[in-house]
């Protein structure tokens, strides 16, 4: 049984597809206070296990740490990090009492699960405007089953998406992709996808192709499809500020970008330099941005991955101005009044600065909503934009789509990958523990960067990562520019890699 409790004036996230009546009174578990923001306090039994929180740090049992659902671009997935890329506010208590809770709140929300006090779970957020769903069941399995029913059917990709994929930030030319295809073919290692990172674009502009490297792109897509390999391009959240660039011009003309309080388009720097963010919470802007995927679909593309959609901010115009002013004062400081640590801190904190997320707004049905109040919905609605567009473009076809940032509800439109991990043994365990927690929240098509995105892998580490990938729906080897080449055929005794990936292909009839 699921009961819905409403506090204040919550923003409609559309996380659920089922309509539930609002319950009266108070939940039968813990204590709730709405006097200064929102807080839920529950005294845990010594034997209680707490599951959930989807893509979050540490173990499957979440006791003993503080987690904050606040979608964050942070490639350093160390044990002390409280936030990663997703916001999945489902917890399940299993023990003396067994129940689940979904805190449908799109801004930052903190879960102190036995950290401050070993026996106390405390959930807090700044504003008392949220929906709380309390799920009662006989077991965690029963609770997950009920929850999955009310949030709607999970995204299922096309069959080829269950095959093996190779990716690297740094593949730049057709020859780079041909070399990868040939390397796998010549070593008799099956492969279904090669991913295109940002270098395929013209100056990192969404829905463009490098004029130098990808002329006759439809023919190149067909060339690889004839080898049973699909190209899967990346799409980033920021639209480059560049007069004459059609996506930019259309967005400015129709006011489809997120704006400052004064109505001007908000400017943040990401890979292309100065960018605007499409206002994907505005249904008209969401439709417009989703329809842009047609540019590549019409050239034969069957899948995409959405990135940088927390949204990541390298710096804002306002933030960089503050850093430059401090740098100017630092340069003139001959008496040591400004400590070097202050300068270093300013440079470090300019990226993804919380102040920047308070500087721009969304237009939602004529209402101006400050971004930080709905921050965790951006990646969800960017991927929703694509998913809804796919239905319009070709309703009979399944497209591959997965995203870095997410919120519960996005599971209906795409899968996720767990972001910029490292070539560390510890991250095999971390990524393994994330998978069941993500499944609880509806994300079935999920996986990690096998081999590790950052740092240099080793032969043994890559093999063990691939062994994990055999059992994750998304099986992709991905690594960063500047790291060791990580394609399976780069290592000795290639037959071991052929065997591991071959096991996956023997499982596909059972997966699909």
Where are these regions (language model features)?
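C-terminal substrate/ligand-recognition segments
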Residues: 167-169, 177-178, 183-187, 192, ...
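A residue-level signal for conserved active-site and pocket-lining positions in enzyme catalytic cores
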Residues: 90, 143, 147, 184, ...
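Short, hydrophobic/amphipathic alpha-helical packing segments
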Residues: 67-71, 84-87, 178, 286, ...
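Aromatic- and carboxylate-enriched substrate-binding clefts and catalytic-loop regions
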Residues: 2, 190-497
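Domain-wide signal for the mature, well-folded portions of proteins, strongly enriched
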Residues: 135, 165, 222-225
């Amino acid at each position: 049984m699921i009961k819905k409790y409403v506090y204040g004036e919550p923003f409609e996230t559309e996380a659920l597809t089922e309509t539930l009546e609002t319950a009266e009174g108070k939940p039968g578990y813990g204590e709730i206070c709405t006097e200064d923001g929102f807080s839920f306090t529950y005294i845990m039994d010594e034997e209680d296990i707490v599951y959930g929180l989807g893509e979050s740090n540490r173990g499957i049992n979440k006791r003993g740490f503080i987690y904050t659902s606040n979608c964050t671009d942070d490639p350093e997935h160390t044990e002390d990090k409280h936030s990663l890329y997703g916001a999945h506010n489902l917890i399940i208590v299993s023990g003396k009492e067994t129940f689940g809770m979904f805190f449908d709140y799109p801004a930052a929300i903190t879960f102190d699960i036995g950290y401050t006090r070993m026996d106390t779970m405390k959930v807090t957020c700044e504003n008392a405007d949220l929906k709380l769903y309390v799920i009662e069941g006989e077991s965690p399995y029963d609770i997950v089953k009920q929850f999955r029913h009310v949030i709607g059917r999970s995204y299922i990709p096309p069959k080829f998406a269950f095959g093996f994929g190779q990716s690297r930030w740094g593949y730049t030319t057709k020859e780079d992709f041909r070399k990868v295809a040939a390397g796998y073919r010549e070593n008799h290692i099956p492969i279904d996808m090669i991913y295109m990172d940002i270098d395929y674009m013209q100056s990192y502009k969404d829905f463009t192709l490098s004029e130098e490297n990808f002329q006759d792109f439809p023919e190149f897509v067909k060339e690889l499809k004839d080898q049973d390999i699909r190209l899967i391009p990346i799409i980033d959240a920021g639209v480059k500020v560049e007069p004459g660039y059609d996506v930019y011009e259309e967005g400015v003309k129709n006011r489809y970008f997120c704006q400052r309080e004064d109505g001007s388009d908000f400017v943040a720097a990401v890979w292309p330099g100065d960018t605007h963010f499409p206002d994907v919470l505005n249904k008209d802007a969401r439709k417009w941005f989703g329809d842009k995927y047609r540019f590549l679909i019409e050239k034969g593309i069957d899948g995409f991955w959405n990135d940088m959609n927390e949204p990541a901010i390298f710096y804002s115009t306002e933030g960089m101005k503050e850093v430059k002013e401090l740098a100017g004062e630092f340069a003139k400081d001959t008496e040591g009044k400004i400590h070097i640590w202050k300068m270093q801190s300013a440079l470090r904190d300019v990226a993804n600065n919380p102040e920047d997320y308070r500087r721009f707004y969304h237009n939602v049905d004529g209402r101006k909503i400050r971004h930080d109040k709905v921050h965790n919905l951006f990646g969800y609605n960017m991927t929703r934009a694509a998913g809804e567009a796919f239905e319009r473009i070709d309703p009979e076809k399944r497209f591959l789509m997965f995203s870095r940032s997410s919120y519960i509800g996005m599971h209906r439109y795409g899968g996720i990958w767990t972001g910029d991990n490292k070539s560390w043994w510890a991250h095999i365990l971390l990524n393994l523990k994330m998978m069941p927690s993500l499944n609880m929240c509806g994300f079935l098509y999920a996986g990690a960067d096998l081999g590790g995105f950052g740092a240099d892998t080793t032969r043994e580490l890559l093999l063990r990562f691939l062994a994990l990938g055999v059992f994750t729906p998304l099986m992709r080897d991905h690594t960063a520019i500047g790291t060791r080449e990580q394609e399976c055929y780069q290592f000795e005794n290639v037959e071991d890699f052929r065997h591991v990936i071959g096991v996956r292909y023997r499982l596909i009839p059972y997966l699909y």
